[in-house]
Amino acid sequence: QAGGQTCAGNICCSQYGYCGTTADYCSPDNNCQATYHYYNPAQNNWDLRAVSAYCSTWDADKPYSWRYGWTAFCGPAGPRCLRTNAAVTVR
């Protein structure tokens, strides 16, 4: 979502408001708006495959700590995910 617009088909939105499916559009490291706002962690038992989010299966095997860091507050915070710094990313 950018400027009130959303990408069709639950695909990702880049930091500049363009839709796509590559890391340029989906990676939170690029300030992108991946579709994790559809992810309700408590309701879905932290299972990214159980939700209707386009990019979810790419990150479904990440550790729980990584998923918590990006999605724990999506429900209460509204239609966007917040970086909480609750997890450390190892590259």
Swiss-Prot record:
The keyword Disulfide bond is annotated on this UniProt entry: yes
Statement: the UniProt record of this protein carries the keyword Disulfide bond: yes
Disulphides: 7-19, 12-26, 32-55
Keywords: Allergen, Chitin-binding, Disulfide bond
CDD domains reported in the protein's UniProt record: ChtBD1
Domain Barwin: start-end pairs: 27-91
Record domain Chitin-binding type-1: where: 1-26
Gene Ontology MF term list: chitin binding; RNA nuclease activity
A GO BP annotation: defense response to fungus
Protein name, per record: Chitin-binding allergen Bra r 2
Species whose genome carries this gene: Brassica rapa subsp. rapa
